[in-house]
């Protein structure tokens, strides 16, 4: 996975980038890039803590590349960073990337080998999981794929996602 990286999108909380350590704790050994905008007052703290793993993008320039669908000028949305990741990836020579928010505290399996719902089982070999996801992505015509999130399993074993696991038309974070 030499041409793959995980981008962690963060703003204003360099001391609470939980996702970085969570990735490592769950067995991800690949490249991690923290994506921070130039208007973030704490960007220097990110650089101090994470060094060359931080990429700072021009938020105003990013805003000019798409319809913001926003009548306000405060630019308090993650969409700027999400869209900037494509240029960042190209500049870094990264062909494939995963975007994550900065507050992930765990990666879990929700199904066993028999496709039976299990409420909680930690992923320990995240490198392997992401490698398989990347191979799946390459084998499809999909423009994006995503992992399920904890909220998808509200209701536990009686919830819709647990009773009838399937591909969903939803990608978040």
Question: Where do the model's predicted regions map?
Answer:
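Short, solvent-exposed loop/turn segments at secondary-structure junctions
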Residues: 13-14, 62, 103-105, 150-153
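N-proximal low-complexity "stem/linker" segments adjacent to membrane-targeting elements
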Residues: 1-27
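Short internal beta-strands
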Residues: 33-37
């Amino acid at each position: 996975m030499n041409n793959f990286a995980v981008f962690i999108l963060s703003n204003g909380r360099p001391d609470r980038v939980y996702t970085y350590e969570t990735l490592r704790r769950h067995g991800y050994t690949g490249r991690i890039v923290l994506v921070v905008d130039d208007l973030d007052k704490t960007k220097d703290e990110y650089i101090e803590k994470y060094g060359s793993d931080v990429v700072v993008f021009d938020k105003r320039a990013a805003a000019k590349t798409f319809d913001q669908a926003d009548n306000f000028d405060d630019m308090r949305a993650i969409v700027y960073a999400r869209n900037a990741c494509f240029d960042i990836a190209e500049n870094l020579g990264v062909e494939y990337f995963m975007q994550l928010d900065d507050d992930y505290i765990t990666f879990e399996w929700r199904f066993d080998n028999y496709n039976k719902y299990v409420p909680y089982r930690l992923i320990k070999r995240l490198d392997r999981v992401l490698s398989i996801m990347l191979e799946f992505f390459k084998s499809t015509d999909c423009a994006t794929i995503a992992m399920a999130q904890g909220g998808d399993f509200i209701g536990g074993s009686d919830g819709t996602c647990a009773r009838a696991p399937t591909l969903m038309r939803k990608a978040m974070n």
